[in-house]
Amino acid sequence: MNDFTFPENKTLVNNQLRNFQYTNGKFQHTIIDPQKPKDNQINIGGTDYFFINLNNSGKSKGSNSIILKLYESQNFDLEDIEYGVPDKILKIFSIPKASKSYLKRSLEKRFEKEIYCLDKCKEKKYQNVITIYESGTCKIFDSRRRVNKEYLYYTMEYSESDLKQFIEENSSMDFKNKINLCLNISKGIKELKSIGFYHRDIKPDNIFIIGETWKIGDLGLISERDEDDEIDKENEFIGPRGWITPEAMNKFLCEGKQLEFNYDCKLDHQSDIFQLGKVFWYILQNNAPVGVFKHEDFQLKYNKLYPIVRTMLNYSKKRRYNDINEVIKLLEPIEKEIQLT
């Protein structure tokens, strides 16, 4: 564990890290000033870092997390302040530890499980899941209650772009790179499955490019195969809206109710395959399959791909692929064929 404490003039306001000062009997909050790096310094595992918000507005990606860029202070020129590529990303769970709320405690358990899964992937030296570095507890001053509170955190590698942003900026990506991208993501799902985890939140925003490799990140909704301690609540809406699976919608609408018919409400590896099919469609032709669709809706003229994606997107798990290995084995010959043309 690598615990640390934020500077005394930092606090959380609406899930955003802010400066604060006590003036005329009132606390005043201001956005962190990137031009004063010495005011924004922390030490993690014996290394000093300057930190800034992920974006200029201070808003973080993710409703339950604070995301900061970290820069090693020894490599930083204080005479010519310029923020380039960060050394790491810091992700902090925005709810204090030891909360008495059942909902907040459940969210904390999910963050702990995310860290556990990323640590397992790091141990295995997996290549298509985001790499974690340190994890532990950090202290941030609560300016309202005037006490330090503890928050879970972890650091990870920096990504230049997520899939959504990348496709919007590279809409003319060639077919070879699209297939390589689909394979990278599939291998990430395979890596998670090999250690007994399902992602359950596969969408373009949670897929990141590191160098030339695509990796899966944001494991906040992962589930462990055959787990005894079930975090999910009955009728909970699990997964990204717009990329939702049939069984996730069944869980939300039907679970635990005395209905005329029985529906599959279990989110598992085949649910990941369904979501991945939607992401493949988005990669291949830049939109998403919604409602009833046919072969003519698939605008790509390469005929070997549509049957693969269509099988992944079947409503019933019985008609989907059982394992992501089946998808990988179908994509690899296509990749080789393209390389020869």
Where in the sequence are the language-model features?
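Activation segment/activation loop of eukaryotic-type protein kinase catalytic domains
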Residues: 210-243
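AlphaC helix of the protein kinase catalytic domain
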Residues: 163-173
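Conserved short submotifs of the Hanks-type protein kinase catalytic core
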Residues: 146-162
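Activation segment signature within eukaryotic-like protein kinase domains
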Residues: 181-182
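Juxta-kinase regulatory segment immediately upstream of eukaryotic protein kinase catalytic domains
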Residues: 1-56
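Catalytic-loop of the protein kinase fold
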Residues: 193-209
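ATP-binding glycine-rich loop module of kinase domains
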Residues: 66-116
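Conserved HxN/HPN-centered segment at the entrance to the catalytic loop
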Residues: 122-144
